[in-house]
Amino acid sequence: MFRRLVYNKNVSALLPHHRQYPTVVRQLTKTERNKMKIKTLVLFIVSIQLAFSQSKTEYLKNNRFDLLNSNFEFPQSNFKIIGFGAYHGSQETEKAENILLENLINKNKVKYYLPETDLGIAYYFNQYLKSGDTILLKDLVRHYGVRVPQEKSIETYNKWKGIKKINDNQPENNKIQVVGIDIIVTYKYTSKLLIELLKIEKGKYKSYDNLYEMVKIDTTDFSPYYDSYSKNILKNFIVDYENDKTYFNSITNNKIITDNLIENIKLTLKKQDREKTIFDNYLFLSQLYDFKSNPQFVRMGFFHIEKDRENNYPSFFTRLIENNIYKKEEIVSIAGFLTKSRVLWDLKYDANKKYIGYTTEGGYGIGDYWKEYFKGINKLKNNRLSNLTLYHLNNENSPYKKNQTDLMEIKLFLKKSNKNDLKGKTTTDYFDFAILISNSQANKPIEELDK
């Protein structure tokens, strides 16, 4: 490679020993020149993007809503299904849900309410909404809470009273209906609904007689999670049902509901994939409820409403998208994030299994602790309007659409985060909205009502 030498008189005059030193100027190679061009182009593109995109702080200030404002209106109305999920066990989470529900119901934007429960329990939540029977409601909350113990709470009990009040203020054609698509939580209300659907004379099937007596006495353990008395009663009934389907189909009050109950009982007798079951139940029950034409509000845990895979495993909402049930933009996902809050943690019992108290947690378990927190949560905290602030994350020109792991990446003290699991993803792949829930007290167990 030849180099061009340039003699510089001014420089050489300052050097000692009267020796002349040439200054060497190396010409860039073709490869180096190309690299410089690429770098310049990249910097230009980045500068253009920055010029047209807002900072996160500016964006959040322009896209935030106060849920506690009496004039609050949810900013999106065009959807097929909308979901709200947050960490379980904190009081203001239930309040946020009630505000969202009331706003959407009043605007006639949702027809069905899908809580994190099974078909049987949901059916009797509908009975409560009609009757106002608080004894029934308390028992429903106890069984509903078997799925999520942190929501077996006074706050959940009061939330349902609030839902009833909202529903009572609606015209008949605008009242919501509760539908359960989750795996069976306990056998009690599944069994009760089966008996209501299948009126069989005493003595025809011993398995049915035993099922009827079990529900009537109501003193057994209704757990589907081990070989309980109720599980064995239902096993025997399923055998008779399968052997005489024609008869049972001829007497049922609702074949679709009966078929779904039977299928879900059978699933409890073997290992099952919960998320797949939720998705399958949704599709099956859509025959009855026509979900595509009647929007639903879903209240489930954080993961179930994510719109993209996490650890390559598809959530309920992700399955709806991947199976072309709905387009991604037809699904709205709202994630709740806690700060300066506490959650219900454990229930305490004495040696006789009598309830004696509970514990709460305000560090681990809320997603905003110095040892464990969501990346980017400080941006929400610094721009909040009230204790319940809603942020629209996927509006036009949102920085959350561009290679961000905010609100999905979990930072851990002295441990590796889940950043690699989110490679190639961005915040709005998962959620459309975020609610910052501040200064929330922990839920109180439903058992506290009996004190």
Predicted regions: what they are:
Residues 1-4, 13-18, 23-24, 29-59:
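Bacterial Sec-dependent N-terminal signal peptides
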Residues 52-451:
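Compositional signal for N-terminal targeting/processing segments
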